[in-house]
Curated annotation (Swiss-Prot):
It catalyses: 2-(N(omega)-L-arginino)succinate = fumarate + L-arginine. Pfam families: ASL_C2 (PF14698), Lyase_1 (PF00206). SUPFAM superfamilies: L-aspartase-like (SSF48557). One of its GO terms (molecular function) is argininosuccinate lyase activity. It is found in: Cytoplasm. It comes from Variovorax paradoxus (strain S110). Its main location: cytoplasm. GO terms for biological process: arginine biosynthetic process via ornithine; L-arginine biosynthetic process. NCBIfam families: argH (TIGR00838). This is Argininosuccinate lyase. PROSITE patterns: FUMARATE_LYASES. The keyword Iron does not apply. Keywords: Amino-acid biosynthesis, Arginine biosynthesis, Cytoplasm, Lyase.
């Protein structure tokens, strides 16, 4: 077929219509310039489909061989940048099919037997997303290991733990970092669970009702290493819940990144001064020469909003659609693609950035002392002396008030002053009131005692190995 003939037949449905499509409509409906990233999945799915057609005797062995030859050339052309993507051909699927037909003639025309673009695109997106989930899983491991590394280096460093952004109790800095490891480990689990539902084969559903050809859908699923086939043809081509579910899991992961970003931004500020982010991950000011700005965590915090917005876009896209396929579903790709790109870029840069953080233990400890972080330890001390907790709570509140008025820490109050609040207080109270003593006392599974933190680090290293 000549190029002129191809151009005239660029629309797969052109014989039915009495006038050509408006150029404005072509531009409005075309998706090739963003869905062309699906080309590998499209070729992979088409080859599996062609192999099945040949195995079932629906196309001949020679046609199958020609399709494989043509697809190999198309793959080489795309990889080299020589492939010409055409707006008139609307999307990645028709672009590849048209080029295949140009290369191998009638064999290329037979490829679409028993297949619709409806089940084709659903298959392509699933294949592509499966691969992206696997890449994201690797990036999540790298980020978790980076957090485990910084935790291991700072097990003994004391950080003020906060509630309501007020100093609450002392914690190990390593323990704090491991909290994010736990969050990201759940994100990884969620994504692996999503993968199970992504990895199902729509091919064979055709436009919406299945096909009269004797297709072997299970063979195609095995060829593509999918976990099974979609069991209802209407559902297979019309729903994008797998994309919504992935974007929901990605949104949660980005929310965890955003929470960590907020803390890094605060900790780097002069008012906290707990950490320094490496220069290569910061920027300066065009007017204020003293500035070193945490742009990376700030942008991650902002990009989280965009990813959550994509989730809302996809949910809204699906909510009003009747069965089966509607053109609305073309709008699933840009939010999905951008979610994947944003999440991968963010995880990649954070894994590197965390490794370049300088921790400032003196500033952290000073902040913990200023905030009376061992007040709860004093209350626990009094409970162990027989005082009901609520009475102990009130007693310690009076002691904190006295320390505040004298502008000293609880541990700096003389024993005689402490005994004014409760005569059962003895000299051993000063062991309890030290930051180190408070930390070591939390020696319970999941607690912040260094021994527990070290055990958790070992557990995470074994899990991530």
């Amino acid at each position: 077929m000549t190029q002129n003939q191809l151009d005239k037949k660029s629309e797969a449905w052109s014989a039915l219509f009495s006038e050509p499509m408006s150029d404005l409509v072509k531009r409005y409906t075309a998706s090739v310039f963003f869905d062309k990233r699906l080309w590998q999945a499209d070729i992979e799915g088409s080859l599996a489909h062609a192999g099945m057609l040949a195995a079932q005797g629906i196309i001949g062995k020679q046609d199958h061989a020609e399709i494989e030859r043509g697809m190999a050339q198309i793959r080489a052309e795309i990889e080299s940048g020589a492939f010409e993507w055409k707006l008139d051909l609307e999307d990645v699927h028709l672009n590849i099919e048209a080029r295949l037909t140009q290369l191998v003639g009638d064999a290329g025309k037979r490829l679409h037997t028993g297949r619709s673009r409806n089940d084709q695109v659903a298959t392509d997106v699933r294949l592509w997303l499966r691969g992206e989930i696997d890449l994201i899983a690797e990036l999540l491991v790298a980020l978790q290991l980076s957090l485990v590394d910084i935790a291991e280096k700072n097990v003994e460093v004391i950080l003020p733990g906060f509630t309501h952004l007020q100093v609450a109790q002392p914690v190990s800095f390593g323990h704090h970092m491991l909290a994010y490891v736990e969050m990201f480990s759940r994100d990884a689990e969620r994504l692996q669970d999503v993968r199970k539902r992504v990895n199902r084969l729509p091919l064979g559903a055709a436009a919406l009702a299945g096909t009269s050809y004797p297709l072997d859908r299970e063979l195609v699923a095995r060829t593509l290493k999918m976990d099974g086939v979609c069991q209802n043809s209407l559902d297979a081509v019309s729903d994008r819940d797998f994309a919504i579910e992935f974007t929901a899991a990605a949104s949660l992961c980005m929310v965890h990144v955003s929470r960590m970003s907020e803390e890094l931004i605060l900790w780097m500020s002069q008012n906290f001064g707990f950490i320094q982010i490496a220069d290569r991950f910061t920027t300066g000011s065009s007017i204020m020469p003293q500035k070193k700005n945490p742009d990376v965590p700030e942008l991650a915090r902002g990009k989280t909003g965009r990813v959550v917005g994509h989730l809302m876009a996809l949910i809204t896209l699906m909510k009003g659609q009747p069965l089966a396929y509607n053109k609305d579903n073309q709008e699933d790709k840009e939010p999905l693609f951008d979610t994947v790109d944003t999440l991968k870029d963010t995880l990649r840069i954070f894994a590197e950035m965390i490794g370049g953080i300088t921790v400032k233990p003196e500033a952290m400890e000073a902040a913990a002392l200023r905030g009376y972080a061992t007040a709860t330890d004093l209350a626990d001390y009094l409970v162990k002396k027989g005082l009901p907790f609520r009475d102990a709570h009130e007693t310690v509140a009076h002691a904190v008030k006295a320390a505040t008025s004298h502008k000293v820490d609880l541990a700096e109050l003389p024993l005689a002053v402490l005994q004014q609040f409760n005569p059962n207080i003895e000299k051993d109270v000063y062991d309890v009131l030290s930051l180190r003593g408070s930390l070591n006392a939390r020696n319970i599974l999941g607690g912040t005692a260094p021994a527990q933190v070290k055990a958790q680090i070992a557990r995470h290293r074994a899990r991530l190995a």
